[in-house]
């Protein structure tokens, strides 16, 4: 099938500005010495279903770190990540809900289930189809160390946050609500955000939202951000920012993922080529800026490249950086524009990304071998693997997965995947 045939299917899923269903207004204050963000949030939840709603569910994933028995903690145990269970309570993090009120500040009844990162809010009146209901919420987020998920507080006192606000669950005849299991798969319908963030003056706020204003008074920096039709808001609050911005004629790309052996001008040219390639094959990216962090790559690296020690470099340096950035940029593009359930329909984004990567390799590196320059060594010439093209890795790994009885259906929810399939295998089916 031709690439544009695949992309026509993607086009059916890509969100448009008119589709934004909810409005979230946030006034947040960072208190570094207390590891805390205090938040006042207003949520205008629009019922776009045909059902009458009597309740609204919220994802409170900041509270998924609160004990050793949460679904997230159990996930860490399954993956043999014992550090979370032996960590001090103060370093795990949690949320503290002060109040949840209606539009006239009347308190509403709310509760948590056994999964402490899900909140059920009982409405004081019916929410009819097409109508909106306003929630006013006040709460505190105590942030965990970043060593558990790479998000949280770093050793240097920086704050890297992803699931830090109360997010409304998706209702499509039934509530799509589930707990945080460190899968980066929060499900939020396209939402408009207005955020005012107060930090000490020496912090730099990194975000892909539009910057409205930034002022500093009495050593407090207030940054106002705006974003339309967003499905996630990741922020980094850094004392010394290592992000560099590359300006292309399509969008701004801000990143701290780099390569020591590639000069900044070459890095910029590579990023520009990737952006133009995706623009040609996927259409315009709907936002003016894209932020790509080292966390994005560490959590979803190019399989194979991440396993090699630094002193072994079978691939050209520009190829390594090119394919790493292509994976980050294409993944970010798809995650920010495809309104799909990332836990149930995770395979959609994964499959499109693998296809795009294969086509990119065919276009710019048609002769690249799976073993890179090692394929030229005579000792490897006796092995079939030395003859494999770089793109052969996908079918090769799939067959290896099948032989080892690791295969699982693509329709399997992501939290039921084996670790190998969660990280690698499912995208290759």
Functional labels for PLM-detected ranges:
Residues 1-23:
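Bacterial Sec-dependent N-terminal signal peptides
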Residues 18-38, 48-52, 155:
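N-terminal, polar/Ser/Thr-rich
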Residues 28, 51, 115-118, 250:
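Coil residues (strongly favoring Ser/Thr
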Residues 33, 129-130:
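Surface-exposed loops/turns
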Residues 38-64, 69, 80:
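Ligand-binding face of N-terminal immunoglobulin V-set domains in extracellular IgSF glycoproteins
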Residues 80-99, 111-117, 122-124, 135-234:
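Extended, low-hydrophobicity, Ser/Thr/Pro/Gly-biased non-transmembrane segments
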Residues 195, 224, 242-346, 352-360:
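Juxtacatalytic substrate-recognition/specificity segment
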Residues 350-429:
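Acidic/His/Gly-enriched intrinsically disordered linker/tail segments
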């Amino acid at each position: 099938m031709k690439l544009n045939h695949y992309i026509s299917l993607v086009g059916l899923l890509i969100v448009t500005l008119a589709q934004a269903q909810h409005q979230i207004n946030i006034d947040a204050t960072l208190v570094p010495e207390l590891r805390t963000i205090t938040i006042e949030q207003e949520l205008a939840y629009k019922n776009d279903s045909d059902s009458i709603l009597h309740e609204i569910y919220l994802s409170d994933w900041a509270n998924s770190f609160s004990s050793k028995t949460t679904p997230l903690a159990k996930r860490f145990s399954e993956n043999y990540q014992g550090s979370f269970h032996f960590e001090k309570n103060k370093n795990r993090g949690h949320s503290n809900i002060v109040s949840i009120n209606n539009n006239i500040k009347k308190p509403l009844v709310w509760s948590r289930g056994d999964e402490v990162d899900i909140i059920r809010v009982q409405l004081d009146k019916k929410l009819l189809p097409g109508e909106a209901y306003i929630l006013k919420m006040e709460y505190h987020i105590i942030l965990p160390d970043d060593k558990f998920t790479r998000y949280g507080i770093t050793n240097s006192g920086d704050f890297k946050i992803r699931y830090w606000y109360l997010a409304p669950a998706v209702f499509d005849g039934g509530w799509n609500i589930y707990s945080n299991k460190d899968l980066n798969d929060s499900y939020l319908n396209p939402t408009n955000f207005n955020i005012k963030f107060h930090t000490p003056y020496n912090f730099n706020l990194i975000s892909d939202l539009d910057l409205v204003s930034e002022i500093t008074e009495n050593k407090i920096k207030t940054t106002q951000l705006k974003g339309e039709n967003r499905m996630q808001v990741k922020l980094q609050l850094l004392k010394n920012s290592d992000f560099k911005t590359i300006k292309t004629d399509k969008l701004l790309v801000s990143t701290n993922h780099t390569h020591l052996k590639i000069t900044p001008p070459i890095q910029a040219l590579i990023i520009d080529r990737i952006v133009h390639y995706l623009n040609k094959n996927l259409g315009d990216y709907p936002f003016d800026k894209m932020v790509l962090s080292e966390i994005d790559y560490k959590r979803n690296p190019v399989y194979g490249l991440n396993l090699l020690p630094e002193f072994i470099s079978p691939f050209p340096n520009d190829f390594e950086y090119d394919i790493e950035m292509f994976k980050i940029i294409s993944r970010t593009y798809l995650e920010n524009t495809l309104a799909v359930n990332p836990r149930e329909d995770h395979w959609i984004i994964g499959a499109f990304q693998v296809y795009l990567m294969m086509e990119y390799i065919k276009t710019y590196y048609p002769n690249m071998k799976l073993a890179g320059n090692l394929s030229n060594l005579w000792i490897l010439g006796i092995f079939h693997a030395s003859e494999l093209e770089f793109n052969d890795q996908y079918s090769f790994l799939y067959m290896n997965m099948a032989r080892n009885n690791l295969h699982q259906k693509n329709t399997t929810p992501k939290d039921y995947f084996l670790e190998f399939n969660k990280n690698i295998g499912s995208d290759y089916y």
